[in-house]
């Protein structure tokens, strides 16, 4: 079942409440101050953006500035394709935070062209993101990315071109098969990277290539397998 509506005014808003399996949802917004909501929605008191089920595909295109993409996704074998063109946009997504469907087999691709955007993606905070394939392609400056993943064989790849970008990534995992791969390829000026891989019963892998930067740049990497608490 899919319930969707658009509200037109100073802002365009899309309300989506999907349950079931096999859904293929394609949403596009052009302009400024639009919302696909969701968590902490404002403007016309928008709620929902809630996807529940399995084997779903969500394709989002937001073209413009100061737009918001907010919500909860509870799905196994989920494909998310997110394209943002413009600046000062907000992306806040939780994937199965209560372990309703688990978060296995997800494939998520986030493409960003623009500056001063804020992205938060939390996947499997109490579930396991088994076989997750997560790709970030970011072109622009002053973007902020925060991601927390309960990994189980997850791959997190980031390709960032631009200056003054900040990345905070935490990968946790507690079962014997947990283990994640994180790869960051960066070209640009000043940057702040804080990477934590915290699998307790398996190996983690990490590769960072960064070209550019200055004395104010910070790169902090922590790999901790039930060891003594560490910090940068």
Task: Go through each PLM region and give its residues.
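Long, low-complexity, polar and repeat-rich extracellular regions
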Residues: 1-232
